[in-house]
Structures are given as structure tokens and as C-alpha cells.
């Protein structure tokens, strides 16, 4: 198979050194794995998330990022609580599906996919609905690439004392933030996003006091984040059920490479430059971005089809043959395709992509 760059929002292109770390087998009960790898990366994750490391902890959970979203909703929302979900895309809507499955009392505020979650609307809703106890939203909604106003939304949620759940699947590690300063109670992300690991597990950065309140609440055995956390705490990195050892080791290497790059701020700068090179190049070819620049994230970029009758499959195949894999669109109101800016990819890769697009008959 011809190698190619994954210009997708995860799974994504990983470094050779991340791949190479998966060539070794690890014993799940040995301290070489649990103490020196799992416990170490749990602490590193908290250190990336906040300077207030004593107040927060991390839980790792097998499966995709959605497993972690479901685990948090299923354990943090008690039977007497009410969840407000603010959605402007498929992943916010998925939170509603999870709440529906668990028969959780919830309300979903739906916003247009090309508009940010409205801070004023959420503020007004909370002022008139005091029964809401928890609020959840997606930071970077990869349905379109829109970036929701995290700081402003967190402020209006925390002012009346509500608990805050943030799906930072496609932003944590790639966009600077401090969960303590923002007042986030549960932040959710995944190994195969901005940290640049491979798929296989997700993680939750949780306020310790709120995680303790999850004891006995979970609606699922395998997704019980309190039980998972307690086992990891007492067992010094031990997982309740078989852990994805190779994926975890690759993630540890990816964390090392994040630090070597200069941390989240440096990675954010690279992603922003990737996005800039991509957008300027595509616009020079006549392509139009779906979103206004002011609300666009540097994570993934949506482009409108350039003309009626545009054959995305043929376009995709042509780019793949030249070493680039992109993403189809995910919204119903417009025909789009998406190009991810994250992973072990650099501005020169996007300059090369633009030249390939220029040479492609579309």
C-alpha cells in the first residue's frame, strides 16, 4: 500500500518514533508498565491540563473518545440531576443520544452548525431554569471545525454554580487551556487527537471532588469512571480490564514529543500555521471556506464544493494517489469536504497539498 498523510481529525498521521514504540510487548501487571508508563502519563496529562495539579486527576478508559463521553455523562449525572447540552454539531447531538439511552433528565439547546454556541442564550437559559445542575458542550466541533467560546461559556456556567463537562476531544493538547482557571469539572479527550497518539483509549481530566461524587452512580460496569479511577489509584496504574498496552506506550512517546516540541503553545502555533498555509493556498485556487475566519479552529477546515456536480470521490481518489487522505463533509445544509491540520504534519506538507490540488482536475 502506498503511504499517505492522514489529513483527518484523528486518527491522524503519527511520527515514526510513536509507531516504533508499539513494536514491544508489555505485561499488564508489571510495574514497568503500570507504574513507569501508566502512572507517569496520568500525571503528565494533569500537568498539561492545569497548574493546579492537586485539585485534578486523570482517568484512562479503553475505547474511543465517545466511550469517555458516555462514561462521564453516565456517572456524573445523578438521578436527581438535570443536564443541559449545548450543541452545534454531530458530537453535541451525540451527547443527547447518550442521555436518551440512559434516561437522564436533559435538555438540548441546538444551534446552527455554522454558528457558535451562543453565550447570551446559554446565560439566559440558566437564569430561567434553576433545575439544571450540569452543562456540557463540545469545544472544537469537528463536524465543521468551529471553535466554541470556551472561556465565555465556562464563565456563564460557573457563575450560577453549575457543573461543567467539556468535550475537548479535538482541542486538548493543541489549544492552550487551564481546566482549573476555567472551572471545568470534567474534560474529555482521546489518545489519537492533538497529543498525536494512536486510537485505543480516551481519558478524562476530572476535579477530584466531583469524581468522588460519581461513586455508585454509573449506569455501566465497564464505563464506571469512579471504579476505574479507584483501581488506578490503588493499583498504581493498574486497569480494571485488559489495557491497550501498545497504544498506551505509543501515547507515552507522543506526550514526550509534545514536550520536545515546546508544549501545547508551540503545537498550537504549528497547527495555526498549517491552517493558514492550507486556507491561503486553497483560496488562491478558488475554494471557499464554510466558516468565517473568526470562529474557525486550527484543527480541521471545511471547504465548500467548488462547483455544481463536483465529484468528491474522484477528488479524494486523486489526492490519495498523490499521498494525501482528506475527509468528506458532515453537514446537511451544504456540500463540503474537510481537511485536518493536526498530527505529525507541517506547513510544507500543506504547501505540497495545495500544489497537488492545483494539478488535479476537479
Swiss-Prot record:
Function: Involved in phosphonate degradation.
Keyword Transferase on entry: yes
Catalysed reactions, as listed in the record: (2-aminoethyl)phosphonate + pyruvate = phosphonoacetaldehyde + L-alanine
Stored HAMAP family: PhnW_aminotrans_5
Keywords: Aminotransferase, Pyridoxal phosphate, Pyruvate, Transferase
UniProt-listed Enzyme Commission number(s): 2.6.1.37
Cofactor: pyridoxal 5'-phosphate
Signal peptide: none
NCBIfam families membership: PhnW-AepZ, PRK13479.1, transamin_PhnW
Location of N6-(pyridoxal phosphate)lysine modifications: 193
UniProt protein name: 2-aminoethylphosphonate--pyruvate transaminase
Gene3D superfamilies listed in its UniProt record: Aspartate Aminotransferase, domain 1, Type I PLP-dependent aspartate aminotransferase-like (Major domain)
GO biological process entries: organic phosphonate catabolic process
Chain's gene name: phnW
The protein's assembly and partners: Homodimer.
A Pfam family of this chain: Aminotran_5
Organism: Bacteroides fragilis (strain ATCC 25285 / DSM 2151 / CCUG 4856 / JCM 11019 / LMG 10263 / NCTC 9343 / Onslow / VPI 2553 / EN-2)
GO molecular function terms noted in the UniProt entry: 2-aminoethylphosphonate-pyruvate transaminase activity
Keyword hit for Transferase: yes
Stated family: Belongs to the class-V pyridoxal-phosphate-dependent aminotransferase family. PhnW subfamily.
The protein's enzyme class: transferase
Amino acid at each position: 500500500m502506498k503511504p499517505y498523510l492522514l489529513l483527518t481529525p484523528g486518527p491522524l498521521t503519527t511520527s515514526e518514533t510513536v509507531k516504533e514504540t508499539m513494536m514491544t510487548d508489555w505485561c499488564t501487571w508489571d510495574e514497568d508498565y503500570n507504574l513507569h508508563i501508566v502512572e507517569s502519563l496520568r500525571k503528565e496529562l494533569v500537568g498539561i491540563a492545569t497548574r493546579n495539579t492537586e485539585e485534578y486527576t486523570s482517568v484512562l478508559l479503553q475505547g474511543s473518545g465517545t466511550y469517555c463521553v458516555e462514561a462521564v455523562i453516565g456517572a456524573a449525572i445523578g438521578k436527581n440531576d438535570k443536564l443541559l447540552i449545548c450543541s452545534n454539531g454531530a458530537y453535541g447531538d451525540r451527547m443527547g443520544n447518550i442521555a436518551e439511552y440512559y434516561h437522564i433528565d436533559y435538555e438540548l439547546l441546538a444551534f446552527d452548525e455554522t454558528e457558535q454556541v451562543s453565550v447570551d442564550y446559554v446565560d439566559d437559559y440558566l437564569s430561567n431554569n434553576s433545575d439544571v445542575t450540569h452543562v456540557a458542550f463540545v469545544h472544537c466541533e469537528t463536524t465543521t471545525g468551529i471553535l466554541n467560546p470556551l472561556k465565555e461559556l465556562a464563565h456563564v456556567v460557573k457563575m450560577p454554580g453549575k457543573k461543567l463537562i467539556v468535550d475537548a476531544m479535538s482541542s486538548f493538547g493543541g489549544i492552550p487551556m487551564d481546566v482549573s482557571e476555567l472551572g471545568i469539572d470534567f474534560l474529555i479527550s482521546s489518545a489519537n487527537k492533538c497529543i498525536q497518539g494512536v486510537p485505543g483509549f480516551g481519558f478524562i481530566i476530572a476535579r477530584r471532588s466531583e469524581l468522588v461524587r460519581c461513586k455508585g452512580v454509573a449506569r455501566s460496569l465497564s464505563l464506571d469512571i469512579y471504579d476505574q479511577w479507584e483501581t488506578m489509584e490503588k493499583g498504581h496504574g493498574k486497569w480494571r480490564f485488559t489495557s491497550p498496552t501498545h497504544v498506551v506506550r505509543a501515547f507515552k512517546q507522543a506526550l514526550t514529543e509534545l514536550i520536545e516540541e515546546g508544549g501545547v503553545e508551540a503545537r498550537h502555533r504549528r497547527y495555526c500555521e498549517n491552517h493558514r498555509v492550507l486556507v491561503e493556498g486553497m483560496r488562491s485556487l478558488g475554494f471557499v471556506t464554510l466558516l468565517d475566519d473568526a470562529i474557525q479552529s486550527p484543527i480541521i477546515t471545511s471547504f465548500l464544493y467548488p462547483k455544481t456536480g463536483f465529484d468528491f470521490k474522484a477528488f479524494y481518489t486523486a489526492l490519495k494517489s498523490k499521498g494525501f487522505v482528506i475527509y468528506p463533509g458532515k453537514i446537511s445544509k451544504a456540500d463540503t469536504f474537510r481537511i485536518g491540520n493536526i498530527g505529525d504534519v507541517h506547513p510544507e506538507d500543506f504547501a505540497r497539498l495545495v500544489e497537488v490540488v492545483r494539478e488535479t482536475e476537479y
